[in-house]
């Protein structure tokens, strides 16, 4: 793995923040009413891909913590981020003088728990989105890689897909049978409801398969996995056997 330089990291972080300035912060979510004030515990928000984690973090950055540090680890330019890179991020965060840090998918980086534990002890308040798998493991006090226990520094929140009420609010539709049928037909993924395009569903499927299954799971035979996934999707509700 080629280690990123401090200057390159600083440039990437700066560009990420500038890109956010041109993106809508998204629709209000019900979970916002129950998100606690930041304390000496790191706030982790987890959920399935496509549930709106990044958009929620953007809303928090835009509405609640506009002066906070921000880094998006779900960025190809930060692929392979590890403990050595966290040392550079540590310096940049310290030089910025910021006391609050918001991270998107920090769990994609190796050594993130140790970094966050250190920053929390230094008084930095942290919010980050994580995968649902990471959230569930931490809820059982297990490390995401299964290597042992984790420090007791986390406050966990789960973000679900759009509820029926969120769907009504987003689409500005009155409650009723027609709205229920449309909700069941269009689904509850915020991004898909927003665009209404089939291509968005295909993109989400590809990301789940490639990023969450192939890459994260270390699966080498991508083609077979794609065929299996397609078979399961097209035969939902039907009995499936290992040799079928």
Enumerate the language-model features and the residues they cover.
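Interdomain hinge/linker elements that couple catalytic modules in large macromolecular machines
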Residues: 2-15, 158-244
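N-terminal pre-Walker A segment at the start of P-loop NTPase domains
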Residues: 2-34
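Conserved lysine of the Walker
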Residues: 53
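Hydrophobic positions on the alpha1 helix immediately C-terminal to the Walker A/P-loop
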Residues: 56
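Short glycine-rich substrate-engagement loop in P-loop NTPases that contacts/grips substrate
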Residues: 69-96
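Conserved P-loop NTPase "ATPase switch" module shared by AAA+ and STAND
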Residues: 93-112
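Structural recognition of the conserved hydrophobic beta-strand(s) that form the central parallel beta-sheet
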Residues: 102-103, 125-131
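Short regulatory helix/loop adjacent to the ATP-binding pocket of P-loop NTPases
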Residues: 134-154
């Amino acid at each position: 793995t080629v280690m990123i330089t401090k200057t390159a990291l600083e440039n990437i972080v700066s560009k990420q923040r500038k890109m956010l300035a041109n993106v809508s912060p998204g629709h209000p979510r019900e979970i916002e009413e129950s998100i606690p004030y930041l304390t000496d515990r790191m706030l982790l928000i987890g959920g399935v891909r496509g549930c709106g984690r990044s958009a929620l973090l953007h809303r928090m950055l835009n509405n609640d913590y506009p002066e906070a540090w921000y880094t998006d680890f779900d960025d190809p330019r930060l692929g392979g981020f590890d403990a050595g890179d966290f040392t550079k991020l540590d310096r940049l965060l310290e030089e910025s003088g910021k006391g609050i840090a918001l991270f998107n998918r920090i769990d994609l980086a190796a050594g993130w728990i140790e970094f966050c534990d250190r920053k929390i002890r230094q008084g930095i308040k942290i919010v980050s989105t994580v995968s649902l798998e990471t959230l569930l493991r931490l809820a059982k006090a297990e490390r995401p890689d299964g290597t042992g226990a984790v420090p007791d520094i986390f406050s966990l929140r789960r973000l679900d897909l759009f509820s029926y009420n969120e769907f009504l609010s987003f689409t500005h539709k009155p409650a009723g049978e027609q709205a229920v049928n449309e909700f069941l037909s269009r689904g509850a993924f915020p991004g898909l409801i927003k665009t209404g395009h089939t291509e968005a569903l295909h993109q989400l499927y590809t990301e789940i398969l490639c990023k969450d299954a192939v890459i994260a799971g270390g699966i080498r035979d991508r083609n077979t996995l794609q065929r299996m996934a397609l078979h399961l999707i097209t035969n939902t509700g039907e009995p499936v056997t290992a040799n079928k």
